[in-house]
Curated annotation (Swiss-Prot):
Has two of three conserved motifs typically found in penicillin-binding proteins (PBPs) and beta-lactamases, but no penicillin-binding activity has been detected. Keywords: Cell membrane, Membrane, Transmembrane, Transmembrane helix. Its precise function is unknown. Has no penicillin-binding activity and is not involved in methicillin resistance. It is a multi-pass membrane protein. Its main location: membrane. It comes from the Bacteria. The chain crosses the membrane at residues 6-26, 389-409, 433-453, 471-491. It is found in: Cell membrane. This is Protein flp. GO terms for cellular component: plasma membrane. The gene is flp.
Length: 498
């Protein structure tokens, strides 16, 4: 067989095998609607991989689907020094995920007729006023909910707020008369102060403290009996220790905080308690169904916000994927809650470190749930053929060694003048064709996770693939390009006649 025929035969086989695998898995992705044991193992690998990459000391993770808990588990440590492991009962500061409780409380008070969303804030917060271009502007409750009040995101910086202004009433008075960034109702600008003001409105309307009203009206009825609000940096038995990274090492962190930020940032809860909250959000009782649906409705467009189309009542929304979600970040904690009411599942990640890997982990878990049929099929097929993949690894390693020996021998021949380089238009054309085919094969390999699994990339897939498959993939890739190098050497060299 000529080199040219061998070349095209090799490439054709590789492409056909790749396409066949993709078609087979796509057509045979018929599995149970529940997450399988393989999926559970995949999820554990994904979580452990992302926590390790983010140097996150501890996290608790909850997945609810179709009203059932598929995962409620702790990973790592809630207290590294004392070696206390994280668990579903570990309490974390959930930061901005507090806002959804505040938003729902406001909507309930409006439903009861105790306030109107179009009310001027000053109706419920006497003497409150803020300016735009030097003129007093009216801000409505709805604009606070939608984050379109014009209140600057940095209005409560340390320069403006001191320890003396540590109560919600005090800090609100401290910002009165300040300048807005834009006219109310015109632009989205995320600011904790919007929800702090909503917390103050709740206090003034109900004649109860914000924390007492939320506890009695929502936490107790939902059986979130271990959820509370931060009052001090002292820790109880189930409270996670917060950490900040110094280099790649987590160190204990106890930053100062202000009680006035409670309605927007300082609920403390666990995945055990949030299980009730997620089930309530996905399948609310009839008397709350319209209220929950209203809390998920878009109030403002969020141009420039990643993965979000709009802001609702304490939630970001993505209409394209039917997602309702919110992240939460403090100096030493982070959280992320994602809901998909259409497909009836929710994901919660709570961590004792402020890390970009928390939203990444949620994204990976969301992909796992959405594609779990394909993933389960892939895992099942691959696990059945581990021994065969080991054989592939041995064969590919042998091929790599042979290619290396041949290339080294060819180089030795060239050095001793035993072979000559070929130069012709035909060789040049074949060389360019080889390069193009290499690129095409590389693109096919790069796209395999999408072709087979529907989304994501190799870095995600490799977090849960068995080691046998990883080795087979790596050696096959190296063998492929080693073979192409050998073919190029055949094309470009010839043995001299003696």
């Amino acid at each position: 067989m000529t080199t040219k025929k061998l070349y095209f035969l090799s490439i054709s086989i590789i492409i056909l095998v790749a396409i066949s695998i993709a078609i087979y898995i796509t057509l045979n992705s018929n599995t149970k609607t529940r997450l399988t044991n393989d999926s559970q193992q995949q999820i554990d690998k994904i979580i452990e991989h992302d926590l390790q990459k983010g140097h996150i000391p501890g996290a608790s993770i909850l997945i609810v689907k179709n009203g059932k808990v598929f995962l409620n588990k702790g990973y790592g440590y809630q207290d590294v020094d004392k070696k206390v492991k994280a668990s579903p009962t570990t309490k974390y500061e959930i930061a901005s995920n507090t806002k959804a409780f505040t938003g729902l409380a406001i909507l309930k008070l409006a439903q009861e007729g105790r306030l109107n969303l179009n009310d001027d804030v000053s109706k419920h917060v006497p003497h409150f006023k803020m300016n735009y271009n030097g003129q007093n502007e009216t801000i409505t409750i709805k604009q606070l909910l939608a984050q379109t009040s014009g209140i600057p995101s940095d209005i409560t910086s340390e320069d403006a707020v001191t320890n003396k202004n540590n109560r919600l009433n005090d800090v609100t008075r401290a910002i009165m008369g300040d300048e807005l960034h834009h006219k109310p109702g015109e632009e989205f600008e995320y600011s904790n102060m919007n929800y702090d003001l909503l917390g103050l409105i709740i206090q003034n309307v109900t004649k109860q403290s914000y924390t007492k009203y939320i506890t009695n009206s929502w936490l107790k009825p939902l059986h979130m009996t271990h959820t509370s609000f931060k009052q001090t940096n002292n820790k109880s038995k189930h409270d996670a220790i917060g950490y900040e990274l110094q280099g790649s090492t987590p160190v204990v962190s106890k930053p100062e905080f202000n009680l006035w930020d409670t309605p927007s940032a300082y609920m403390m809860t666990s995945t055990e308690d949030l299980e009730h909250w997620i089930k309530f959000q996905l399948n609310p009782p009839d008397k709350y169904k319209s209220l929950v649906q209203q809390s998920h409705k878009n109030l403002s467009s969020t141009i420039g916000e990643p993965n979000a189309n709009a802001y609702a009542s304490g939630w970001f929304t993505n209409n394209d994927e039917h997602l309702v979600f919110h992240s939460g970040t403090l100096d030493n904690f982070s959280s992320f809650i994602l809901l998909n009411p259409k497909q009836n599942y929710g994901i919660v990640v709570l961590a004792n470190l402020n890390s970009e890997y928390v939203p990444k982990l949620v994204e990976h878990l969301n992909t796992q749930i959405v594609n779990h049929k394909r993933y389960s099929t892939v895992a099942s097929i691959l696990n059945q053929y581990k021994d065969q993949f080991n054989i592939v690894t041995v064969l590919m390693t042998t091929l790599i060694l042979l290619a290396f020996i041949f290339s080294a021998y060819r180089a030795w021949q060239m050095r001793h003048g035993q072979i000559l380089l070929r130069r012709s238009k035909r060789i040049a054309v074949l060389s360019w064709l080889t390069l193009c085919l290499c690129i095409a094969i590389a693109l096919i390999l790069y796209a395999l996770p999408y072709l087979i699994l529907g989304s994501n990339n190799w870095s995600f897939v490799l977090t849960w693939l068995p080691i046998e498959i990883k080795l087979a993939l790596i050696t096959t890739l190296i063998a492929l390009f080693s073979t192409l190098i050998v073919i190029l050497l055949f094309l470009h060299t010839k043995i001299t006649k003696t």
